[in-house]
């Protein structure tokens, strides 16, 4: 026989076997060459058996084995009145392009429409799990079930119904990636089925995912563990007296640009719970187009487990139409933009809410912290630009069972140091605020800023005298102390009238009169003051050897002189308006101007005391030299110059 005729007969026989209508289980051997094989006639399984079993060549993948169900074709698993309905399609390592309808068979428990592992499914029409017929304890079949599945859904996937049992899931299994542009729905039953259920799920939703209707309990739209959900559509719990959740499970990460809703309860005029986090480490990122209807709940922590949730409002998301319930031992962290809950916030025993100053302000109708619950406040804000920061606010009040359970932590603060921040309820008990203790008038007023090495704190609000009779630890209400090896920046014009003492680290002045009306400016050994180009006026300067006063293009006016044993550096001007400034430090790197005004006195004893500075003298300049001194500084003005000491002056 001619070779070409034999090939043609072989192809015709394959085409006939694929195109013929069959009843009973059929097996299709896919070719493994990446060329799709088509099903053009309907197939129905019998006696609870699968309609279509897929066989593939050894060591081939789903990308090489492709099966297409053509338009108007029905593939349905066999019915069983005593057992499980048959699968519509069963196999491994293949791709299914569905343009028809694939059904699981009806049975005591409904059959799965498409069952197997390592499958890729492109669904352009309908997939139906089989219906359960067994009554109590039975269930509808899943639309899709297996492990290592990729689902691109453009039309509809349904779990099977079971009027006496539980509806089937639309999609179930582990290691499943879903891109949904159509609808995925759990089946109906006494308890509704879940839309998608499983573990290690990666879901992108651009349309609708819903739990099934339940006579008692609606199904969850998405449930399981290790779930990532990027939602741009609607994810909705199933209807029922107890409605299902939009999302339920543990280790869940949600990016929400769409609608997440629990069932709307018309009798209560409110939504049932939208999201339940049952354990693990969870996150919820909400955006301006986010809609959440119903409460967000964290279950009590599992035995030997954890339950943490990070809620981040990325860009001013709309209000959450529900509350926040934090179960025993669980923790919530809120950050980003302000978060508004139209319901209530409740924090149970050993649970915690974690907030950051200058970050999210959380608002709710009522906020209740039960006994042994905790508020952990991160006060590590680097730029303090408000008199106070609101952390929590409430329409009807904030109830805190134990104020000692408001705990502050601050990575800018030297370990073990007294905090410069105080967090408490306001007088009306409807706001929790953090403020600088400098401004506290209820016994916690405090003026020391102890900044950790390599840390920087900028104070951008004006500091005035605290006149309260109730201050902390002997503070006078008007003196500022900088301690710790880090950096403090004063970037506002201040009005305090006490002393400024830099014990260690660096104090940077970033505004005119940042030192207020300082009486005495003290610089201890190892401390530095950087004037950073701004003018300051104080009464008296007292610097220890080993300190640095960096004029840095600024101007410092001394109304009552002082003693400078430390280093003066940079350029700019140091003006002595009154009293005597006695300089004994090494200032060879100072290239600015000393101005001695009428009635004032500048005393130096070596060339290094003046550095390379100009001296504009209208008062008295005393050069007390004990050794030979070659004076190279330019001296101007009409003041007196006095030479004392045994050294020669040239």
Could you tell me what each predicted segment is?
Residues 3, 15-35, 262, 283-294, ...:
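Extracellular/surface-exposed low-complexity segments
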Residues 24-105, 435-493, 581, 649:
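N-terminal segments that cap or nucleate solenoid repeat domains
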Residues 6-13:
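Sec-dependent N-terminal signal peptides
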Residues 222, 241, 264-277, 284-295, ...:
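Surface-exposed loop/turn positions within long extracellular repeat scaffolds
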Residues 42-51, 72-88, 99-113, 124-145, ...:
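Glycine-centered low-complexity coil/loop motifs and glycine-rich tracts
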Residues 53, 65, 69-74, 93, ...:
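Asparagine/serine/threonine-enriched low-complexity, disordered tracts
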Residues 38-40, 49, 59, 70-72, ...:
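Tight coil/turn sites that cap or link beta-strands
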């Amino acid at each position: 026989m001619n070779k070409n005729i034999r090939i043609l007969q072989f192809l015709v026989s394959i085409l006939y076997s694929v195109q013929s209508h069959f009843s009973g289980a059929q097996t299709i051997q896919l070719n493994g060459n990446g060329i799709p094989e088509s099903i053009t006639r309907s197939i129905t399984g019998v006696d609870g058996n699968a309609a279509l079993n897929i066989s593939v060549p050894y060591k081939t993948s789903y990308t090489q084995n492709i099966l297409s169900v053509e338009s108007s074709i029905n593939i349905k698993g066999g019915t069983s009145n005593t057992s499980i309905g048959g699968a519509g399609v069963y196999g491994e390592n293949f791709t299914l392009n569905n343009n028809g309808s694939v059904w699981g068979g009806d049975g005591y428990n409904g059959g799965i429409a498409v069952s197997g592992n390592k499958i890729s499914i492109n669904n352009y029409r309908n997939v139906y799990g089989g219906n359960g017929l067994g009554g109590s304890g039975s269930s509808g079949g899943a639309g899709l079930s297996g492990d290592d599945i990729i689902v691109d859904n453009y039309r509809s996937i349904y779990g099977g119904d079971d009027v006496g049992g539980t509806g089937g899931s639309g999609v179930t299994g582990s290691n499943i990636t879903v891109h949904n542009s159509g609808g995925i729905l759990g089946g109906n039953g006494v308890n509704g089925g879940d839309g998608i259920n499983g573990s290690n799920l990666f879901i992108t939703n651009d349309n609708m995912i819903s739990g099934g209707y339940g006579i008692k309990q609606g199904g969850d739209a998405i449930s399981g563990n290790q779930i990532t959900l990027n939602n741009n559509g609607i994810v909705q719990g199933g209807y029922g007296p107890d409605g299902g959740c939009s999302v339920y499970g543990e280790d869940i990460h949600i990016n929400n640009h769409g609608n997440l809703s629990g069932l709307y309860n018309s009798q209560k005029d409110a939504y049932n719970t939208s999201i339940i986090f049952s354990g693990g480490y969870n996150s919820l990122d909400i955006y301006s187009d986010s809609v959440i209807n119903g409460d967000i709940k964290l279950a009590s922590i599992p035995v030997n487990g954890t339950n943490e949730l990070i809620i981040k409002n990325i860009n001013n998301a709309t209000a959450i139409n529900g509350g926040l319930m934090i179960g025993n031992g669980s923790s919530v962290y809120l950050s980003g933009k302000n978060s508004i809950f139209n319901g209530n916030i409740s924090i149970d025993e050993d649970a915690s809410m974690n907030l950051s100053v200058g970050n999210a302000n959380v608002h709710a109708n009522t906020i209740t912290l039960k006994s042994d619950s905790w508020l952990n406040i991160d006060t590590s804000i680097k730029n303090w630009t408000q008199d106070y920061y609101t952390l929590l606010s409430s329409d009807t009040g904030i109830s805190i069972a134990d104020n000692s359970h408001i705990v502050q932590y601050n990575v800018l603060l030297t370990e073990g140091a007294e905090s410069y921040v105080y967090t408490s309820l306001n007088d009306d008990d409807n706001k929790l605020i953090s403020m600088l203790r400098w401004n506290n008038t209820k016994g916690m007023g405090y003026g020391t800023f102890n900044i950790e090495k390599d840390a920087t704190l900028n104070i951008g609000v004006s500091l005035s005298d605290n006149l309260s009779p109730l201050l902390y630890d002997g503070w006078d209400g008007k003196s500022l102390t900088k301690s710790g090896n880090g950096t403090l920046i004063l970037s506002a014009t201040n009005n305090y009238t006490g002393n400024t003492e830099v014990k260690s680290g660096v104090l940077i002045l970033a505004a005119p009169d940042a030192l207020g009306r300082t009486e005495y400016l003290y610089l201890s050994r190892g401390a530095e003051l950087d004037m950073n180009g701004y003018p300051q006026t104080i009464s008296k300067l007292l610097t220890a050897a080993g300190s640095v006063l960096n004029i840095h293009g600024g101007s410092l006016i001394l109304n009552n002189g002082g003693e400078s044993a430390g280093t003066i550096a940079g350029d700019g001007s140091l003006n002595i308006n009154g009293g005597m400034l006695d300089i004994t430090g090494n200032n060879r790197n100072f290239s600015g101007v000393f101005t001695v005004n009428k009635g004032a006195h500048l005393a130096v004893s070596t060339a290094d005391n003046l550095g390379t500075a100009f001296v504009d003298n209208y008062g008295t300049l005393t050069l007390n030299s004990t050794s030979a001194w070659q004076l190279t500084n330019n001296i101007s003005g009409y003041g007196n110059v006095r030479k004392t000491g045994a050294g020669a002056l040239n």
